[in-house]
Amino acid sequence: MSRFAKVERKTKESDIVVELDLDGTGQVSIDTGVPFFDHMLTSLGTHASFDLTVKAVGDIEIEGHHTIEDTSIVLGQALAQALGDKKGIRRFGDAFIPMDECLAHAAVDVSGRPYFVHTGEPDYMVQFTIAGSAAPYHTVVNRHVFESLAYNARIALHVRTLYGRDPHHITEAEYKAVARALRQAVEYDPRVTGVPSTKGTL
């Protein structure tokens, strides 16, 4: 059964198209107009082994925030759609990811009950900016990215930085940890034939 989704969302602030194949091989094409966000979504798709195409046009001349958050909303919706009835999946996943001096952890429950927890980032990341050739990426949006993804995918997602100093490393480790946790959670478990829940539904 194909676990593919294509979701489009158009507002006055952005026009987003996301194509997602959960059973891909990490083939990724990202264009949001925010170079560092492109880099992060490329890492996410690659390390989750998803085939992921994202095309976003937004009001980045004002700021990249709208485009980043709206893209995360659509990505979450695509994930929910691609998961379908969730039969046979592992449901839970988690991963620790080091990046030089930084260590990040993510845990996922494909529960149908959206929830998000984000802890451990240094306070200075609220004001830090990663410059790019076009729109910059403000690391304060990390929380918005993962929260929008979790609530629209209807998953419980916990992301934490255990320690780290460089905002680039912290951000990238968080994205990669989420990617690896998602990869584990959405994989098929050969011992599970139905929905992995005592309720019989997720």
Curated annotation (Swiss-Prot):
- The membrane spanning regions, by residue number, are none
Q: Could you tell me the keywords of this UniProt record?
A: Amino-acid biosynthesis, Cytoplasm, Histidine biosynthesis, Lyase
Query: What is an example of a Pfam family matching this protein?
Result: IGPD
Which pathway or pathways does this protein act in? Amino-acid biosynthesis; L-histidine biosynthesis; L-histidine from 5-phospho-alpha-D-ribose 1-diphosphate: step 6/9
Q: Which GO terms describe its molecular function?
A: imidazoleglycerol-phosphate dehydratase activity
The record's EC number reads 4.2.1.19
Q: Does the keyword Amino-acid biosynthesis apply?
A: yes
EC top class, as a word: lyase
By its UniProt entry, which PROSITE patterns does this protein fall under?
IGP_DEHYDRATASE_2 (PS00955)
Classify the main location.
cytoplasm
Question: Where's it found, cell-wise?
Answer: Cytoplasm
Q: Name one GO biological process term.
A: L-histidine biosynthetic process
Instruction: Spell out the reaction equation it catalyses.
Output: D-erythro-1-(imidazol-4-yl)glycerol 3-phosphate = 3-(imidazol-4-yl)-2-oxopropyl phosphate + H2O
**Domain of life here?**
Bacteria
Q: Which GO terms describe its cellular component?
A: cytoplasm
Q: Which family does it belong to?
A: Belongs to the imidazoleglycerol-phosphate dehydratase family.
Q: Return the HAMAP family for the record.
A: HisB
Q: Which PANTHER family match?
A: IMIDAZOLEGLYCEROL-PHOSPHATE DEHYDRATASE, IMIDAZOLEGLYCEROL-PHOSPHATE DEHYDRATASE HIS7
Please identify the protein, giving its name as recorded.
Imidazoleglycerol-phosphate dehydratase
